[in-house]
């Protein structure tokens, strides 16, 4: 074989090995994602959502009060 064929073959093997290592490093995250999908997501706690809703209502009331104080042009 000529040198240019050996260099081409070397680069092809190098690229193939790089792609395989990238694929193999992806496998653990893929398995983790499948386990996460099968087990289902953790149920969210309701209390933070209730606090968020109360804060939203409070800000909405403050905004309405502020708008009521503005003069009408």
UniProtKB/Swiss-Prot annotation:
UniProt keywords, alphabetically: Antibiotic, Antimicrobial, Cleavage on pair of basic residues, Secreted, Signal
- Spell out the subcellular localization from the entry: Secreted
Give the main localization category: secreted
Keyword ATP-binding appears in the UniProt entry? no
Query: Propeptide per record: which residue ranges?
Result: 45-73
**Keyword Signal attached:** yes
> Quick one: a GO cellular component term?
extracellular region
Instruction: Classify the source by domain of life.
Output: Eukaryota
Summarize tissue expression.
Expressed by the venom gland.
Signal peptide position in this chain? 1-22
Q: Which GO terms describe its biological process?
A: defense response to bacterium
Please describe what this protein does: Antibacterial peptide.
Q: Which family does it belong to?
A: Belongs to the non-disulfide-bridged peptide (NDBP) superfamily. Short antimicrobial peptide (group 4) family.
Could you identify this protein by its name?
Putative antimicrobial peptide clone 5
Q: Say which species the protein is native to.
A: Tityus costatus
Lineage start: Eukaryota, Metazoa, Ecdysozoa, Arthropoda, Chelicerata
């Amino acid at each position: 074989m000529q040198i240019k064929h050996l260099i081409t073959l070397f680069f092809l093997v190098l690229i193939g090995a790089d792609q395989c290592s990238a694929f193999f490093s992806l496998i653990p995250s893929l398995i983790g994602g499948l386990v996460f999908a099968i087990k289902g997501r953790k149920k969210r706690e309701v209390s933070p959502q209730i606090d968020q809703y109360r804060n939203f209502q409070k800000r909405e009331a403050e905004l309405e009060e502020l708008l009521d104080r503005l003069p009408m042009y």
